[in-house]
Structures are given as structure tokens and as C-alpha cells.
């Protein structure tokens, strides 16, 4: 009886223990995904904050293409019936997916897009570090034994952010760094055994660059055969890529292949040997030490017969081959289109650095004493010392490259802050000139080609509806409103205005320019808070719109042709002495010879 009682009690205790283990296992089962999701949310928030601070601190502003992408979103939200993709920039579905929802926030769209582009570019370093960390094969070790993999990840992350041309692309808010990040994110997801997420990243990258189509298609075939439950996702992704690239242009432009048509005859196309030209652009993304490190990683992959490393090497080579084919077709094959394979090579170089460090450190102390006694151990010790020496030489040879990149970043940031001044002041100039509606009423807006999309975005117009050939438009005698950057601000001039509109359009003629820098004397009579900001130098230059008096001659920038070959295609400023007049002051018939008028703002109303 006692035996049966003890047997039942032991069984109940075992059952209770198994139930506890089941509950604890279940709790760990749902806690781990939550922890992973929380960590990713934290990293995403930090990267987003870094992107916003990068936008604020560096003066990053969108370029011609990026303003054109933002115009697409604003046109769909504000004037969807007039939305068209007929002109520059080339159609990219990836950017449209972001600029469309951002357009709902008005002019905050600029901040949202620039911060998103900056954050995505900075995230490329994160995914490069994670990919190199996993490629070392040391991720399953204890934390303290992973230090070679951590060094490999740091090397790859910093190396990708140091790609030549990446600072400029980040500061003008283009989509190319974003595509680099998506490709590296797909690699990281695949190495983390998340093929569905990897395919989704490849689909997004394929919406940004056509070179990714080949890799997305190959990965779709592999997922269809090897990954259970992924066929619906694969089918949707395969259909989304051509739909995004061709359906919308077919509905909003004269050609469904408008992106390829606009890329033909681009100024960056290669005119000589296409193969040599593309390879030269690819190798120019980094200096010789990094090239040798990537080549060493490829040799190491061949020696070890690592399929993953060899597959990544083949993918990088295939990307370069696709770019060569594009160059033969007449497309530009620019340097920024080769950043993706260069980033993959840097990841491989970082992983090779990690494996060399692990080989040099693994059992080095244990083999140091026997190395002095036996030849076999001595040879192994020499190999370990050689691996460590290679890493040290690589680090020393990259030190000048790091200094050059720091100087490059400083120069790019300084230039970006200068370029940001007229871009930021254009919105205020448009407001002081009466707003977009009045400006469009007075005539077609015209500016220089570099500011065409910027002006279109500020006036809520399509890029193609803004003129960019100033001289031709001025001499055409059609009603126009001419915008020209001047003295940190803008000159706005309505020209050839219809007689019935002249009274209403008189307000449009302004000189919105810098009149001074706030000083301590400026703070007199201001509220205390504003005066404190003036004294501390928080406020920037003071801008004042100056309007022209009625009847004054318009001072505009025109385009004239001269008989002398050296004076052709020069811009002339009416009301200011022209450069050709100073070189030939006695030349007869020159319209500006010996003439010097008052500045445009003298005597004007404030």
C-alpha cells in the first residue's frame, strides 16, 4: 500500500515537472520573438533618429532627381489628373512608394524623404556588419570568443560607409544608397535563414534598380522549390516588379519604357571601351588596399571551397557583367550603380579579416612553446603570425584612406550647406512673390536646369511644365516668370506679361536676398528670447524681399550670341557690367561696353 502511494506521488511529481517545463518552454518560445522584435525596433528607431540628425546637421537636401520623385507624390495627392512621368527624372517605383505617402504632410515631405534616405544609407553599415559577422562562421560561439567576428563586422560596416561617392549620394538624398541597403539586408536575411524576408528585400531593391531583376528572379526560383509556404509571396513579388516599372509609365507617359528611353544618351555614358570603362569605375570605388583585401577574400573562398562565399563572388561579377551590357546598350553605367557589388566585396573582405584573426588567435599561446621544439608546430606558428601580420598591414595601409574619407566628408558637408541655402529660401521667395497660384497665373515659371525640379515642387507643378532654357524662353516673347538664384536668395521677374494681368503680377517682381547677418546690435529692442538667440548666433542671415517700383526696367539674366568664339554661350546680366565688356571696352556695337547701371535693389521698396 505504501509502495503504491509512493509510486503515485512520484508519477504526479514527474507530471508536474513536465508541465512546468512545457510552460517554461512555451514562455521562452513567445518571449524570444518578442525580444528579437524589440531589439529590431530599437535599432530601427536609433537609425531613424540618426538619419534625421544627419539631415539637420549636414544640410543634406534633395537633388534634381529626388525633387522630381517628390513631385510625383505631390501631383498624385494634389492634382492626380495632371500626374505624368514623361520627363526627367527617370521613373523609379521604389521612390514613388515613399514620396506618395509623404506628400500627405505637405512641405514636410522634404524632411521626411531626406531623413528616410539618410537613415537607409546609414543602415547599409548595419547590414554589412551583420553579414560579415555571420560569414565568419563564429556566430554560434560564446560571446567572448566572437571578438574576431565583431572586428570583421566593424571593418565591413565602416568600409561600406566609406565607399567613394557614397557621401555625395547621401547628401543629395538619392535612392542608390537605399538600394545598397536593401541588397545587404537581403543577404543578412538569407544568412539568418529567413528566405521570405530576403526575397521581400530583393523585390524592393528590384523596384529601385533593374540590375536586381536577375537576382530577384533567381532567388524566386530557389524559394519556389526549396521554401515551403512561400509560393504566394514569390508569385506576388514576381508580378509586382514589372507592374511597378511598366504599368504606371504606360498610363502616365507616352511610352511604357520611359525609364530606359530617358537613360539613353546620358552624359555619363562610356564612349570608349565599355568593358574597361565599367571595370575602371568599379575599381575606383575604393583604393588599392581594399581591392587587395577583397581579392584575398576571393582566393580564400576558392581555397576553402566555401559555397556561400563563392556564390557572393559570382553575384558581384554578374552585376558588373550586367552593367557592361547596359553600357553597350547606351545606358550610362554610372559609378553609383556599381556600389552594390563593391559593398558585397567589402563584406567578403571583412569576413576574411575575421577568419584570419580567428586563425591567428586560436591556440596561439598553446603553440608558442612547442614551436621552438618541433618544426611542424613552428610552421603552423609561422602561418598564424603571417595571418596576423596581413591584418596589421591592411589596417596600416587603410589609415591614409580613412584620412582621405574624413576630408572628403568635410568637403561634401561644407558644399551641401552652401547648396542648401537657395533651396531653403526658394519656398519663402515663392510665398513673398504671391504664392504658386499667382505665379502660374502670370506666366510659365522658368529657371536654370539645376533648379527645375526644385521650383516645380515649390509651385505644385510637374517638372516638365517648368522651363529650364532661360535664354530661349526670354527671347520667345511668351509670358514667363523667371527665377534666378542671387546673393543667397532669389530674383523673381515676370516678363512679357499680358496687359490685362500686369497690375496683378506687379507683386511677383521681387529680390529676395540677404541684407545682413544678425549681430549684437540687432538684438536691441527685440524680445528677450529672440535677442538671446541673436547674440548667441542661433539665427542665420536676414532675408528681406525687395519689390521693384512700377516702371523700373527689369534686370534679368539673358543668353546672347556673340561673333567672337570665346564669348559664346555666356550669361549676361542687364544692369551690370558684362565680362566681355571689361575684356573689350572699346569694341563698337557691344550693348554693355562702358555701361554700368545701378544695382537691382537700390532705391527699391522694402
Regions found by a protein language model. Give the residues of each.
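Signature aromatic-anchored transmembrane alpha helix within multi-pass, membrane-resident enzymes
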Residues: 39-43, 146-154, 235-243, 293-294, ...
Amino acid at each position: 500500500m505504501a509502495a503504491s502511494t509512493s509510486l503515485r506521488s512520484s508519477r504526479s511529481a514527474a507530471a508536474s515537472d513536465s508541465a512546468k517545463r512545457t510552460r517554461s518552454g512555451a514562455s521562452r518560445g513567445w518571449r524570444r520573438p518578442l525580444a528579437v522584435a524589440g531589439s529590431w525596433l530599437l535599432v530601427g528607431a536609433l537609425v531613424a533618429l540618426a538619419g534625421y540628425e544627419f539631415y539637420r546637421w549636414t544640410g543634406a537636401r534633395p537633388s534634381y532627381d529626388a525633387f522630381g520623385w517628390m513631385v510625383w507624390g505631390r501631383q498624385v495627392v494634389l492634382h492626380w489628373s495632371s500626374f505624368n512621368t514623361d520627363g526627367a527624372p527617370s521613373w523609379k517605383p521604389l521612390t514613388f512608394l515613399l514620396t506618395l505617402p509623404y506628400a500627405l504632410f505637405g512641405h514636410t515631405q522634404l524632411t521626411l524623404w531626406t531623413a528616410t534616405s539618410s537613415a537607409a544609407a546609414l543602415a547599409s553599415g548595419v547590414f554589412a556588419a551583420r553579414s560579415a559577422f555571420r560569414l565568419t562562421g563564429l556566430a554560434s560561439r560564446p560571446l567572448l570568443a566572437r571578438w574576431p567576428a565583431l572586428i570583421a563586422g566593424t571593418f565591413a560596416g565602416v568600409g561600406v560607409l566609406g565607399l567613394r561617392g557614397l557621401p555625395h549620394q547621401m547628401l543629395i538624398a538619392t535612392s542608390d544608397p537605399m538600394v545598397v541597403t536593401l541588397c545587404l539586408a537581403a543577404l543578412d536575411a538569407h544568412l539568418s535563414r529567413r528566405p521570405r524576408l530576403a526575397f521581400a528585400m530583393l523585390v524592393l531593391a528590384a523596384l529601385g534598380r533593374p540590375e536586381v531583376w536577375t537576382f530577384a528572379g533567381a532567388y524566386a526560383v530557389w524559394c519556389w522549390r526549396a521554401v515551403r509556404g512561400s509560393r504566394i509571396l514569390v508569385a506576388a513579388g514576381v508580378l509586382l516588379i514589372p507592374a511597378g516599372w511598366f504599368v504606371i509609365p504606360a498610363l502616365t507617359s507616352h511610352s511604357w519604357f520611359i525609364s530606359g528611353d530617358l537613360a539613353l544618351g546620358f552624359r555619363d555614358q562610356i564612349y570608349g571601351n565599355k568593358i574597361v570603362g565599367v571595370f575602371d569605375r568599379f575599381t575606383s570605388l575604393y583604393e588599392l588596399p581594399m581591392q587587395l583585401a577583397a581579392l584575398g577574400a576571393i582566393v580564400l573562398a576558392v581555397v576553402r571551397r566555401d559555397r556561400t562565399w563563392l556564390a557572393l563572388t559570382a553575384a558581384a561579377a554578374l552585376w558588373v557583367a550586367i552593367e557592361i551590357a547596359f553600357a553597350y546598350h547606351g545606358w550610362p553605367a554610372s559609378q553609383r550603380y556599381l556600389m552594390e557589388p563593391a559593398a558585397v566585396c567589402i563584406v567578403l573582405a571583412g569576413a576574411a579579416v575575421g577568419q584570419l584573426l580567428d586563425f591567428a588567435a586560436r591556440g596561439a599561446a598553446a603553440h608558442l612553446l612547442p614551436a621552438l621544439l618541433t618544426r611542424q608546430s613552428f610552421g603552423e606558428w609561422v602561418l598564424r603570425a603571417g595571418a596576423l601580420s596581413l591584418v596589421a598591414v591592411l589596417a596600416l595601409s587603410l589609415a591614409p584612406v580613412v584620412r582621405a574619407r574624413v576630408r572628403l566628408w568635410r568637403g561634401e558637408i561644407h558644399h551641401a550647406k552652401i547648396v542648401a541655402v537657395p533651396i531653403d529660401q526658394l519656398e519663402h521667395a515663392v510665398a513673398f512673390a504671391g504664392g504658386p497660384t499667382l505665379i502660374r497665373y502670370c506666366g510659365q515659371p522658368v529657371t536654370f536646369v539645376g533648379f527645375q525640379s526644385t521650383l516645380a515642387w515649390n509651385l505644385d507643378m510637374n517638372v516638365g511644365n517648368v522651363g529650364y532654357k532661360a535664354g530661349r524662353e526670354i527671347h520667345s516673347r511668351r509670358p514667363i516668370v523667371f527665377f534666378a538664384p542671387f546673393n543667397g536668395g532669389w530674383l523673381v521677374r515676370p516678363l512679357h506679361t499680358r496687359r490685362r494681368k500686369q497690375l496683378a503680377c506687379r507683386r511677383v517682381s521681387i529680390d529676395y536676398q540677404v541684407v545682413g547677418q544678425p549681430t549684437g546690435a540687432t538684438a536691441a529692442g527685440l524680445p528677450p528670447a529672440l535677442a538671446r538667440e541673436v547674440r548667441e548666433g542661433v539665427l542665420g542671415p536676414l532675408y528681406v524681399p525687395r519689390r521693384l517700383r512700377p516702371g523700373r526696367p527689369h534686370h534679368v539674366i539673358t543668353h546672347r550670341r556673340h561673333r567672337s568664339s570665346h564669348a559664346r554661350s555666356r550669361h549676361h546680366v542687364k544692369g551690370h557690367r558684362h565680362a566681355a565688356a571689361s575684356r573689350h571696352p572699346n569694341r563698337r556695337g557691344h550693348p554693355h561696353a562702358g555701361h554700368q547701371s545701378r544695382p537691382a535693389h537700390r532705391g527699391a521698396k522694402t
